[in-house]
């Protein structure tokens, strides 16, 4: 875990958050970004959480409330934090547009180097919790577990350029969430069909099927 006085880059903190689910890394990132948002803030973490909720709302997440940066919901963090499968999928879709995030969640293992308060450097190795990574088009994901939420997992799949985002909430065991994820992805790709919206021998100048004939006077 991170100790007071440790120094690391934002990307290293992101790796510590996303690969081994480091709640300490989530807090560090929240405090750092919160101060960037408002240098005068007296509570950088609260400033960051406020920005989280505002960003979620802009994405169309109507069923989400964040109360802390790491997602824990018990003891000192107990409250009304919640989300939905739909909202988590929206957030995953948006996050996967970021190249750094995309590369981090696609990492099977990684390491970060942290400079301690005494100036010494020490390395931390990390292994992903995503046991599906690299299988059947799985290109990344994030686990989450609490007693109230159960075993959760959101992931991204890409098969032949068709990318989808899956969300499993409140699964019964850590293994079951991965089984459910694979089943969900396989169902989608197995039931996907291509439907021709035009069936005609006539083609337009660029080779596409002719959809309709409209007289020149109809355009005026």
Regions found by a protein language model. Name each.
Residues 1-86:
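Active-site-adjacent loops and short helices of periplasmic peptidoglycan-processing enzymes
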Residues 61-62, 77-220:
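Domain-terminus/edge residues, biased toward the C-terminal soluble/receptor-binding domains
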């Amino acid at each position: 875990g991170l100790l007071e006085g440790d120094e690391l880059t934002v990307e290293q903190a992101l790796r510590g958050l996303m690969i081994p689910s480091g709640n300490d890394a989530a807090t560090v990132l929240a405090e750092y970004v919160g101060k960037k948002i408002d240098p005068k803030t007296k509570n950088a973490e609260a400033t960051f959480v406020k920005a989280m909720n505002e960003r979620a709302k802009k994405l169309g997440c109507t069923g989400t409330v964040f109360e802390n940066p790491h997602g824990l919901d018990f003891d000192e963090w107990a409250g009304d934090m919640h989300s939905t499968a739909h909202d988590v999928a929206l957030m995953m879709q948006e996050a996967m547009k970021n190249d750094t995030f995309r590369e981090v969640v696609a990492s099977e293992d990684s390491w970060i180097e942290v400079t301690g308060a005494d100036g010494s450097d020490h390395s931390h190795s990390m292994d992903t919790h995503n046991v599906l990574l690299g299988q059947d088009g799985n290109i990344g994901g994030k686990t989450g577990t609490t007693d109230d939420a159960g075993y959760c997992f959101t992931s991204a799949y890409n098969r032949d350029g068709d990318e989808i985002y899956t969300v499993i909430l409140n699964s019964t065991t850590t293994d079951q969430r991965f089984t459910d994820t694979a089943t969900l992805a396989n169902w989608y790709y197995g039931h996907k069909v291509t439907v021709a919206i035009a069936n005609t021998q006539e083609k337009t100048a660029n080779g596409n099927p002719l959809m309709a004939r409209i007289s020149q006077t109809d355009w005026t």
